[in-house]
Regions:
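Glycine/charge-rich catalytic "coupling/switch" loops of P-loop NTPases
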Residues: 148-187
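C-terminal boundary and immediately downstream tail of ABC-type ATPase nucleotide-binding domains
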Residues: 123-145, 173
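Residue-level signal for tight coil/turn positions that link beta-strands
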Residues: 109, 144-146, 176
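Generic, ordered loop/turn and secondary-structure boundary motif
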Residues: 27, 134-135, 160, 180
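Short helix-capping and hinge/turn segments at secondary-structure transitions, especially at repeat
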Residues: 106, 126-127, 135, 139, ...
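Short secondary-structure boundary/capping segments
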Residues: 79-80, 141, 162-163
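ABC ATPase nucleotide-binding domains
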Residues: 1-129
Length: 187
């Protein structure tokens, strides 16, 4: 109404988003008659009806139980894709960020540490904070010289990508799934 849109258009767009969110059957219920997930879907549908250029979602799933959070992640991701509205999604939940986002900005003390795709942030973190914030990792000290990385125990490996790297001490992030167990004497 405040946007000077006629009632028929409001009804049409409201129904469109209620259907998209799979909550048409709850359209006439009062908030106290809805579950937490239904309330979240209604709130999202209301926000989408006005066709914003950008949608800000600040911890939208923080008050939901674990099962409902997973379900709502899927609903939000599907809605983002089908509607095509740029969404800024604020969360402290790394799993939620990785599941919903096309691009992620990881912040520490109000300073952006890394912006990238979920895969980029996970596999090529810009610093130790980002590496340890997203997923599990092992941080080990090493030294790089002439394309060879040498660890504290003396183990070393030539890595082509390090051929042009300046000699320096480094910290390596090694994800648990990257470890391969071999029998003694095998490479």
């Amino acid at each position: 109404k405040n946007r000077k849109v006629d009632k028929a258009e409001i009804k049409k767009r409201t129904d469109e988003f209620l259907n998209l969110m799979q909550i048409m059957q709850y359209a006439d219920r009062m908030p106290n008659q809805l579950s937490g997930g239904q309330q979240q879907r209604i709130a999202l549908a209301r926000a989408l009806v006005i066709s914003p250029d950008v949608l800000l979602m600040d911890e939208p799933l923080s008050n939901l139980d674990a099962k409902l959070r997973v379900e709502m992640r899927s609903v939000i991701r599907h809605t983002q894709k089908s509607v095509g509205i740029t969404t800024v999604y604020v969360t402290h939940d790394q799993e939620e960020a990785m599941a919903i986002s096309d691009r992620i900005a990881v912040m520490k003390d109000g300073v952006i540490q890394h912006v990238g795709t979920p895969r980029d942030i996970y596999q090529r973190p810009k610093n130790v904070f980002v590496a340890t914030f997203i997923g599990r990792t092992n941080i080990v000290n090493a030294h790089v010289k002439d394309g060879i990385i040498t660890f504290a125990d003396g183990y070393h490996e030539h890595i082509d990508a390090l051929d042009k790297a300046a000699e320096q001490d480094v910290r390596c992030s090694i994800r648990p799934e990257e470890f391969i167990i071999c029998k003694d004497g095998t490479d």
